[in-house]
């Protein structure tokens, strides 16, 4: 029987315990939502970095016009970088290009998960595709659903996203052993509207105060894209259907 854990923040990841595990990273507002959206709109890869300096170094190694450089630090878009939110990235003509991407939490969480056997990026936007991939390829494996959080703090929207994934696992009828955190996440999801929950979160409130309701609403959509984003050799790519 597969076991599903939900970790409340990326700081709970223990690299020594990751071998043999499947890790699914969530940063609903907005890193993993942006990653899924970019791959759904033709980006050939998303290359996540821990900070803007490393992202700039990677960009310098690539031909101009072959990539989009995007990132933020503490919710402020980095100078010289494109805005890192999903709808903003849709205006960047990503088709056929790499997205070089640095964020405060989501890309850091992906980096912390790299010792796992398999690492994926997930959001509300690709929940069904993500769960189907795990059921098809990783049945029986231990799955860690990692909420990125913010600077060692719990984030409501990531926990809601984890609950959506757990709810989808349950709806498929497969037997899973759930930790208490996984059960709690599912209960939150099953009794709360997505937009309501995201808007009530600290990050969601901040985005709304900046006139970015459209970005929050976009990220609140469930299973809009049939995208599976897998991290391999430092790059997130869309798996073929």
What are the residue ranges of the model-derived segments?
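Structural motif
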Residues: 4-5, 21-24, 44-47, 65-69, ...
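Short acidic, Gly/Ser-rich segments with clustered Asp/Glu that frequently serve as metal-coordination loops
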Residues: 11-16, 23-37
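Short active-site loop/helix that positions an aromatic residue
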Residues: 34-41, 58-59
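Class I S-adenosyl-L-methionine
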Residues: 47-93
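Long, charged alpha-helical interface segments
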Residues: 80-118, 132, 156-241
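Short, structured patches in soluble enzyme cores that scaffold and shape functional sites
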Residues: 103-105, 123, 145-149
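Glycine-rich phosphate/diphosphate-binding loops that line cofactor/substrate pockets in enzymes
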Residues: 134-142
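Phosphate/ribose-phosphate-bearing ligand recognition and processing surfaces
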Residues: 148-158
């Amino acid at each position: 029987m597969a076991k599903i854990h939900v970790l409340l923040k990326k700081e709970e990841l223990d690299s020594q315990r990751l071998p043999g595990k499947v890790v699914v990273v969530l940063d609903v507002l907005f890193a993993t939502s942006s990653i899924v959206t970019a791959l759904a709109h033709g980006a050939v890869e998303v290359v996540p970095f821990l900070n803007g300096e490393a992202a700039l170094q990677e960009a310098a190694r690539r031909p101009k016009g072959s990539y989009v450089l995007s990132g933020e630090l503490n919710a402020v878009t980095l100078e010289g970088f494109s805005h890192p939110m999903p709808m903003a990235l849709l205006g960047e003509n990503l088709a056929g290009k790499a997205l070089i991407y640095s964020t405060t939490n989501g890309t850091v969480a992906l980096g912390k998960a790299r010792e796992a056997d398999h690492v994926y990026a997930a959001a509300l936007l690709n929940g069904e595709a993500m769960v189907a991939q795990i059921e098809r390829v990783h049945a029986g494996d231990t799955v860690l659903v990692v909420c990125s959080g913010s600077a060692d703090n719990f984030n409501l929207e990531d926990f809601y996203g984890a609950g959506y994934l757990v709810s989808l696992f349950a709806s498929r009828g497969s037997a899973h052993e759930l930790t208490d955190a996984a059960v709690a996440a599912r209960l939150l999801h099953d009794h709360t509207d997505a937009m309501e929950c995201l808007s009530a979160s600290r990050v969601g409130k901040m985005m709304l105060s900046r006139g970015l309701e459209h970005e929050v609403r976009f990220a609140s959509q469930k299973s809009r894209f049939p995208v599976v984003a897998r991290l391999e050799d430092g790059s997130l790519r869309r798996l073929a259907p």
